[in-house]
Curated annotation (Swiss-Prot):
One of its GO terms (biological process) is mitochondrial translational initiation. It comes from the Eukaryota. The keyword Mitochondrion applies. InterPro entries: Pentatricopeptide_rpt (IPR002885), TPR-like_helical_dom_sf (IPR011990). Its main location: mitochondrion. GO terms for cellular component: mitochondrial inner membrane. This is ATPase expression protein 3. It comes from Candida glabrata (strain ATCC 2001 / BCRC 20586 / JCM 3761 / NBRC 0622 / NRRL Y-65 / CBS 138). Required for respiration. It is found in: Mitochondrion inner membrane. The lineage of its organism: Eukaryota, Fungi, Dikarya, Ascomycota, Saccharomycotina.
Amino acid sequence: MNALKRLGTTLAKNGDQIIEGTKELDQISVKYFLGNTRVSNNEKSLVSISSNKSRLNFNQLIKDNAHLIGKGSQYQRKVVKHYLSPLIGHKLRRQDIHNDYNKQLSHTDHIITPTDRKREAFSSMELAVDILPLLIKSTKKPVTKPAKRRLFKPYYTKEVPPIPDFKGDMKLFEDYIALLTHTKFLYKNSSSSNGIIPKILRVLIHPSNLNTIDLRSVQCYNDILYFYSKKYDFATCRELFAQMKVEGCKPNTTTYNILLLNLVKKVHMRKIRSIKNELLFYLRNMQKNGIFCDTVTWNTCYNFLNDEMSRDLYIEKLIDCGVPLTSELVYSVVRNSSKAHISTKTKYILDMFGEDGESFVNLKFVNLLISDLVLDHNVERAWSVLRYFELKQLKFVNQPKFLINSETMNTFLRYFAEQGRIDLCFLTYNYFVKDLVGPNKIRPNVNTFDMLMKSLVKNGYTETLPTVFEVICALSERYGIKIRNDGYWSLKCKAIIKFQYKSSSCEKNKTELLNKLNNFSWGKQLPLFTTKVWKNGNSEVRKICRMLGSIPIPLRKSRKLGDKETVDRSQNRSVSEKKKAYRNRIKYIAIGNAMARRIPYANNWHQSFKDEVTKRGLLASER
């Protein structure tokens, strides 16, 4: 751990110089764009599939338009070419894609080439020697700190806010773009690649859209770059970067940081071509355009190095250049250090925090430590670390500092769900949501209830499975989270209930279980964390475990082969096939709906876009 030790030594000497980044915040809310009226969420689907007759029409519709949206239709390629058509005078790779891809040759090359040779090998030390001079030359003292942070809701379950009438207001345009790109809109999968938000962004930022060309600032482009970067659409990011140059919008440090982040993501993909030349191109381009590096640039470039010698050299030069040590940099160093001895590394990090490590202890650090320990199957130690930081939150009285969030909870739930421990999942869920000590209570998200359903499925076919499923759905509704019909684990639960159980859950049992679960938490019915819930719990705890179906396997009722209730193997196989067909049918409907929504766009993109935004009430001028 050379880089980690060097950083630890520097922190011991200059701990007061650690920066968290700017504390100045700018909050952008969905309500700002909604006004006093709301759009009704009861519109009919584009394709109705409620009856057998309509399902036949639905299937026929897709077959008749397979040449527009099916295999070989090149639908996405045509959309991209249409978007790039105003930039025809500039050389862009996707303006003219030839159908010369040799699938057989590619498949053969994939089979015969060893996995460890898929990436073009390059020395990490050579890369450090190449990039350090460029970074040093582009670093202006004092090194700039990250820009003002903006706060967004992570997800939103209602309709997308309508497109406002900007009337030349650049700030309004920037805020609307920022909201669409940083908040995930779950309603009708609006933020997905096939949703309405990518279409809105393309219209607003289209090269031929003269109404918004004067409103497009570098901040708008950076937000859209970030949106497509999250979707791993690196080609669109490169095209937007080229469009910025064509329109005379000068990129800034954040622009290059996002492009460098794309390369970091590429490093972890199995590619034959190296990213070295592309990395050097961006750094030289920064120097050519007079764009200075900030702490984020240095932190991002650190992630390209993959051995301790180059990392140690990099940290040494970073300190010599006077680059402030940010909590993000410390996080990168810790995350990329060896995971061979996770417990030893955790102790080293906790010692490095010291008694007053407030300057760089943050949410990402806590989640990293807990995740490492849980992956090492040291869940008891992970819970001790959680309790340590839970109490540490109380020290930040004047300026509350949140060190625990829903991702922390989901880390534990993910581990318990994999083992089918629904009792531990509910104990953990209730503790985080209701009994956590600190300035905030944790709000569950979609992944939280996915993990509860996974634990229910992994727990096996118990008598109470339908009731527990209804309880999970009821808990999710309390937070305005609708269980997805095509979610993997929810769909699996529904298939099991439909074909394995003769009757659905009883409302009385559901209400009783919900009431019992109110006090089912660590610190209440179980004073200390333990994985042996049945053994260490009292009679009330065991009763709740029975209602959840979480009974130790040796104590579960087993059916003998001679019993009448025993189902033969052929019947089990038949039920299994029915469940699989049921899940596949729902997946097919979901895929078919997505394809059907593309049909009008394949015929007339602009008219179809206008029809959809009008139908959903997304034009503020028409409301």
